Amino acid sequence: MMISGLRSSFSFFTLVPSRQKDIGNPITFLPLVVTVGALIGDSILYITWQFSHLIASFLSISSIIIYNGLNHFDATADLGDALMVRDKSRIPEVIKDHHVGAGGIFAVIFVYGIAVLSLARSTLYIGLVGILIGQVVSGSSMMISLIGSQPFVPGLADYFISLFRKHSVGYTIEFLAIPIIVSFIFSPLYVVIVALNLLIVQLTKTMISRRFGGINGDVIGFLGEFSRSLFIFMLIIIAHYNVASTYDIFSKMLSSFTS
């Protein structure tokens, strides 16, 4: 059962292939999936940081996008195009359209540009922490967005909402507790950033849901990407103004490796 759940999570949320025809329940092990993505992004950031902060940041975020199979990247572009549509009845048609318009291009540049530029302006330590917690918050944001939601078209959102409702209390606790615990390990202040991040993302979901008449897979994917970028941006601002101390045990360990 556990192996099947792991396969479902990795095959659905990443480019890792699987022979399973039924996607099963990919929700439970999503925190593990996003953590692996964070380790990939952090590894690339750490290795390439000495050459160019901007290139290192770009490669790190790109590696996570590729690890996700470009699914959420595509979702971000689709949502950007859909938000440009004035006629509500045309939204499902625009989201399914494979062509990318001005709205989609802007959404991609905005969401990923925030993450890349923020990382490039940070220290290596803050960048590594930002990617790790940002990934965890990203996964939680996607799942928490299912609470009280309705799909505006039949599809993956409908399936995920039904899965979530079967264990709504357990999943809600899981996806709220994990980012809080992970962020608290580094700094209690990061818990505040996580809480504010989740609140902003859920408010964003509410506005999109009212505009579209519900959510779909693209909305869920976009919220995850937006959440990661938003967390990294917020963390870098806090660190820039020295509100959060980076002189903890993890910072000292990293300094010993890089010195």
UniProtKB/Swiss-Prot annotation:
Pfam families in UniProt: CobS (PF02654)
GO cellular component, one term: plasma membrane
Keywords: Cell membrane, Cobalamin biosynthesis, Magnesium, Membrane, Transferase, Transmembrane, Transmembrane helix
Cofactor or coenzyme needed: Mg(2+)
InterPro entries: CobS
GO MF term (any one): cobalamin 5'-phosphate synthase activity
Biological or metabolic pathway of the protein: Cofactor biosynthesis; adenosylcobalamin biosynthesis; adenosylcobalamin from cob(II)yrinate a,c-diamide: step 7/7
Gene Ontology BP, a term: cobalamin biosynthetic process
Membrane-topology annotation of the record: Multi-pass membrane protein
Subcellular location: Cell membrane
Transmembrane segments: 27-47, 51-71, 100-120, 124-144, 175-195, 219-239
EC number, UniProt record: 2.7.8.26
Reactions mediated catalytically: alpha-ribazole + adenosylcob(III)inamide-GDP = adenosylcob(III)alamin + GMP + H(+); alpha-ribazole 5'-phosphate + adenosylcob(III)inamide-GDP = adenosylcob(III)alamin 5'-phosphate + GMP + H(+)
Record family assignment: Belongs to the CobS family.
Protein function: Joins adenosylcobinamide-GDP and alpha-ribazole to generate adenosylcobalamin (Ado-cobalamin). Also synthesizes adenosylcobalamin 5'-phosphate from adenosylcobinamide-GDP and alpha-ribazole 5'-phosphate.
UniProt-recorded name of the protein: Adenosylcobinamide-GDP ribazoletransferase
Organism: Thermoplasma volcanium (strain ATCC 51530 / DSM 4299 / JCM 9571 / NBRC 15438 / GSS1)
